[in-house]
Regions:
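Acidic/histidine-rich catalytic cores of soluble enzymes
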Residues: 1-72
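Short, well-ordered coil/turn segments that N-cap beta-strands
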Residues: 1-3, 28-30, 90-95, 124
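Charged helix-capping and loop-helix junction motifs
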Residues: 16-20, 79, 112-114
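Residue-level preference for long, well-ordered alpha-helices that form the structural scaffold
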Residues: 21, 73, 77, 107-110
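Surface-exposed alpha-helical segments enriched in charged/polar residues
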Residues: 23, 86-89, 116-119
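A short, acidic, amphipathic alpha-helical segment used as a generic capping/interface helix at domain edges
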Residues: 76-89
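A short, acidic, flexible beta-alpha connecting loop/helix-capping segment that sits on the rim
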Residues: 97-107
Length: 126
C-alpha cells in the first residue's frame, strides 16, 4: 500500500480538519509536517474562502489569501498540536518534522522558540 506524509498546516488551510485527515490515512500515515498558524493573522484559515475550488490552482494563484505573517513559531499559534501528536502516536506515525516557512524573527530565535515549545508537549521521544 501507499504510505503518506501529511502537512497538517496546509491540510487546515485547505479547509480540512487535520485530525480527520489523519484518521482517514490511518496506519498509512508515516510522517507529519507540523507548522503553526499565527493567532494574529488577518488571513482566512481556509484558503478556499478566497480561492475558487473549481479552478485549477496555479503557481500564480497559490498564495492568494496567504501571507508570511500567517506562520508563527510552533506552540505559539492556534493549531492543536498536542492533539496532532496524540493522533500521530495512536496511528503509529514514525516522525513529526517541525517546519516553518516564514518567521518575523531571526532564524535562530525562531528555532529556539519552536524547540522550547515543542519540548513542552507530551508523547514525543527525543
Amino acid at each position: 500500500y501507499v504510505s503518506f506524509e501529511l502537512d497538517t498546516f496546509w491540510a487546515m488551510r485547505g479547509g480540512m480538519d487535520p485530525l480527520a485527515v489523519m484518521d482517514r490515512l490511518g496506519d498509512r500515515l508515516k510522517l507529519i509536517h507540523q507548522k503553526d498558524f499565527s493567532k494574529t493573522s488577518d488571513s482566512p484559515i481556509n484558503l478556499w474562502t478566497v480561492n475558487d475550488p473549481n479552478v485549477l490552482v496555479t503557481w500564480d494563484s497559490f498564495g492568494k489569501g496567504s501571507d508570511h505573517k500567517d506562520f508563527c513559531e510552533i506552540g505559539t499559534g492556534i493549531m492543536d498540536i498536542q492533539s496532532i501528536i496524540n493522533k500521530g502516536n495512536e496511528l503509529g506515525a514514525e516522525y513529526i518534522v517541525l517546519e516553518q516557512d516564514h518567521t518575523q524573527l531571526t532564524q535562530m530565535e525562531s528555532v529556539r522558540i519552536s524547540m522550547d515549545s515543542f519540548h513542552k508537549f507530551s508523547g514525543l521521544d527525543w
